[in-house]
Structures are given as C-alpha cells and as structure tokens.
Amino acid sequence: MKLTCVLIITVLFLTACQLTTAVTYSRGEHKHRALMSTGTNYRLPKTCRSSGRYCRSPYDCCRRYCRRITDACV
C-alpha cells in the first residue's frame, strides 16, 4: 500500500516537473507546440475576391457585397 502511494506521488511529481520545464524557448518559439496559448488568434491573411468572382458570403468579396442570385461579388 505504501509502495503504491509512493509510486503514484513520484509519477505525479515527475509529470508536474516536465510540464513546468516544457515552457522553454528556442529562438523565440516554444519547443512544445501543444503547450502554446490557444487564446491568440492564428489566422492566415485572407484575400478578398474582386467583382464578378464567385462568392458564398459578403465577407468573401472586397466590397463586402455578394449578389445571391448569381453568387458573384459586385
């Protein structure tokens, strides 16, 4: 019983040590990407579509207007 408790505490301690030391930086970036903050916004720059191009929503078009009849940017 005591040996089991000691083993469990040891495993928990080693896991906690690894998590706290995993936030080391290498050239300004995290070594472990899984531990990076997910609160920041990592979006690729979106290009808008010119008039006459196919669109599904107004946000696809540069002028923010998508004609629903023809599904084309205006």
UniProtKB/Swiss-Prot annotation:
Family annotation (Pfam families): Conotoxin
Positions of transmembrane segments: none
Maturation-removed propeptide residues: 23-45
Domain of life: Eukaryota
Main location: secreted
GO cellular-component term (any): extracellular region
MF annotations from Gene Ontology: ion channel inhibitor activity; toxin activity
The keyword Mitochondrion is assigned to this record: no
Segment forming the signal sequence: 1-22
Tissue specificity remark: Expressed by the venom duct.
Keyword annotations of the record: Cleavage on pair of basic residues, Disulfide bond, Knottin, Neurotoxin, Secreted, Signal, Toxin
Annotated S-S bridges: C48-C62, C55-C66, C61-C73
Subcellular location: Secreted
Keyword Signal: yes
Protein family (similarity comment): Belongs to the conotoxin O1 superfamily.
Free-text comment about domains: The presence of a 'disulfide through disulfide knot' structurally defines this protein as a knottin.
Descriptive protein name: Conotoxin MiK41
